[in-house]
Amino acid sequence: PGPRSGVRASAMKRSLYDWDEGAYLTQEEERVIDELEAMLRPPALTMAPYPAKSIVLASGEVMVVREATIDEVDTLLKIIQPLAWLDRDYYDIVSARLFAELLAWKKYRVRNEYCLVGVIDGVLAGIVNGRMFDEGHGVSYHTLSLKRGLRVGAHLFASKMEHHIEYLGQDEVWIVAESPIGHRRWMIEYPLDKKFEVQHELGGAPSWVLSRETYFKAKSRLVSGTRPVPAELLARSKPILEPDLSTMLVQIEDTLEARL
């Protein structure tokens, strides 16, 4: 059933519609829903912003790394969703989980989440996300590279660690990998310490940890970027544009073949 006849357009815009009952909610019913929504949303800590930076890639292209906003989540979801069916290098599970995490952020069903994006001439090149567990501990969620062969994922992961340690001021970050490449990139390259007594949120896998000490030892090798980003360059990172899907899939296949 649709909205009842005789209801003004202005009322339709203001009121919530109960499709099961075939009627608009009363003001009292809407008030109860608002109260329930407030109860369902997790409490949030104040989070310091991540200052945008630019990174010159091996190709000579310049990637802007900046925080994404909740208003950009729908765009990110449209780009991520097709990759959930790509059974290569764990793109399927990483994309599916990242999709759910970003949707939960948009719907206020996750505590203290953030998302950083890498953008080249407006086109999305990669995404990383995570959250604050508490003021001293961070949780790394996912790193998804849409442009392979230029260490986009490695640069974005390093930016994520920079955010946790330097801007959120945390003592350590809990990390797991879902692919052998991820294990090599994070656990070995930094290197990370074992903290297997901590079950990670991603399926309860044993956690590895990046401490402040390890981060600052690795920073000169692994953390890149220049600040501030020129206003014109930063402006070109918005709105986020979708990469060509066919080109992206071919590139992913080619880089995997080169590693085999």
Regions picked out by a protein language model, each given a short descriptive name:
Residues 176-177, 192-211:
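Conserved catalytic-core motifs of GNAT/GCN5-like acyltransferases
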Residues 1-15:
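N-terminal amphipathic/basic-hydrophobic helices that include classical n-h-c signal peptides
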Residues 150-165:
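Conserved acetyl-CoA-binding loop-helix of GNAT-fold acetyltransferases
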Residues 13-59:
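Short acidic N-proximal helix/loop "leader" segments that mark the beginning
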Residues 222-254:
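Short, cationic low-complexity segments
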Residues 80-137, 143-145:
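A conserved beta-strand-loop-helix scaffold within acyl/acetyltransferase catalytic domains
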Residues 62-78:
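A short beta-loop-alpha structural element at the N-terminal edge
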Residues 173-188:
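Conserved beta-strand-loop-alpha-helix junction that forms the acyl-donor binding cleft
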